[in-house]
């Protein structure tokens, strides 16, 4: 299963594609289950105070993995089209996490369609283009003037009394 010496190149590529397709379907199912457990708060009877704690402590997920999956699951419960897009490989977990906070009833179909089959970076650009943040105004601030009496060099001697 983990040794590929006797596997032809074309066969290896086909196996990889099939595994990725299965992984996409499993990820969509996993998100659906996480979302339902989260909604029912079934982590509480398991001795966990949050879905995040349950994922990390009971399911042995990394913190990053737990965070991404929970947020994606919550977005997918609100907008079930996400499950379909993840299952067919049109949208990845990172993309769901970028899009999730931006989705609403009015824009979710259009945004999900535009994000389909795009990289995380391209989805970030899509989000930025649709909801640009105002530029941070340039600020100039006056720095406090150095005080000869307060300026301490080596040995705590004020600059005016120090020898060069």
Regions found by a protein language model. Name each.
Residues 1-164:
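Short helix-coil boundary/hinge micro-motifs
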């Amino acid at each position: 299963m983990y040794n590929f010496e006797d596997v032809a190149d074309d066969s290896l590529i086909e196996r990889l594609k099939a595994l990725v397709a299965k992984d996409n379907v499993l990820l969509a199912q996993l998100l659906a289950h996480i979302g339902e457990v989260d909604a029912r708060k079934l982590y509480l009877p398991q001795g966990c105070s949050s879905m995040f704690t349950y994922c990390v402590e009971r399911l042995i997920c990394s913190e990053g993995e737990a965070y991404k999956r929970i947020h994606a699951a919550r977005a997918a419960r609100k907008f079930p089209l996400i499950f379909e897009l993840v299952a067919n490989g049109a949208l990845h977990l990172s993309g769901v996490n970028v899009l999730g906070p931006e989705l609403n009833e009015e824009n979710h179909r259009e945004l999900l369609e535009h994000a389909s089959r795009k990289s995380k970076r391209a989805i970030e650009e899509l989000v930025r283009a649709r909801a640009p943040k105002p530029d941070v105004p340039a600020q100039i601030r006056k720095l406090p003037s150095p005080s000869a009496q307060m300026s301490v060099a080596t040995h705590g001697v004020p600059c005016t009394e120090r020898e060069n």
